[in-house]
């Protein structure tokens, strides 16, 4: 978010009963004198008093709970700079282990040399995956004699994309070719995708967990379509899987879904460690099936144990604590631990979906049976005067942050509401939410609703 002119309140109120009580403390300039640590702590703490509870935030995919031991370990390693491989070689080794664990989880072929790196989140990971596709496409196209300056290269993706892909296309001058979703295709329409592909296509993005609804693109079917396409042309097109949400969930709960490096044309995958990898924000990961898919000019060398280590990141200095937190989780939970946690989360999501459906007011778009996301709209014949925006507002009064928003272009007339179920949302908390949900509906049914005839569609709450 960009900030500009400060608000009217120029000064913080002095701390009660403290030595600073006799002077004002400026907000937007540095104070002349230092404060006691206790006073500075209390001032900042009080500034955050009226924010929502992270545990009650059903809008965010980001992890809002970690074990005390994990939090302690991360707080003890905040000073470690992840980029300083020579100074912190054991930290570099833990990152290497994480990449190997993820490669194994995503079935990287044993006869190829996978590569991967940590990032500050899936947005950076998507940028890196997109950059690799662009540079690799350019190299292939030049070799085949294509005039790469005749038109902009393009990226094909469904309209359910996360905003980071739009940023990538703007920042790196790529034409985004969007395959629209419709009522019959609430994910990538693989029957239409080849209509958007040509010799200037750097790649196709398949999404394992669409932000709007939680649904999966059919990566297997997409692979089949591109295999057919690639068999007829020298201008090969490959798949990057944006598995920000599903990359650390699907392998444990639905291992039979084939979406990863087992597919011939899937060459790179990103995920968020701070979503279903169960780490606090922000940590992401991106892997390439083989080093041949990662152009050498994007790789930089850093000093490491008297030698050099290849790195590829947009950001530079950052704390290694989240990498260490990710390794802690891998060590702590193992495969069965992750599976148990995610299955419980899935059960909670399906419980919530059933309770929502039982009210009789809603059509369920996603029932949490895959990714633990509950998504629904008001029935056309619901015969109520209130909207999902009203319901979101009423729930917020009870502390729950639940977004309501229109679907992407071509479906923007459909307003939906979504819950993201995370590991810290247990059945007891879910039951409390349903009680508040039902009470909110009852209050709205008894309320005198005004002005909806002129209300414009918008967004209530944070949707990504």
From Swiss-Prot:
The modification N6-(pyridoxal phosphate)lysine is found at residue 275. It is an enzyme of class 4 (lyase). This is Glutamate decarboxylase beta. Converts internalized glutamate to GABA and increases the internal pH. Involved in glutamate-dependent acid resistance in gastric fluid. GO terms for biological process: glutamate catabolic process. Its cofactor is pyridoxal 5'-phosphate. It catalyses: L-glutamate + H(+) = 4-aminobutanoate + CO2. One of its GO terms (molecular function) is aromatic-L-amino-acid decarboxylase activity. Pfam families: Pyridoxal_deC (PF00282). Belongs to the group II decarboxylase family. InterPro entries: Glutamate_decarboxylase, PyrdxlP-dep_de-COase, PyrdxlP-dep_Trfase, PyrdxlP-dep_Trfase_major. One of its GO terms (cellular component) is cytosol. It comes from the Bacteria. Keywords: Decarboxylase, Lyase, Pyridoxal phosphate. Its EC number is 4.1.1.15.
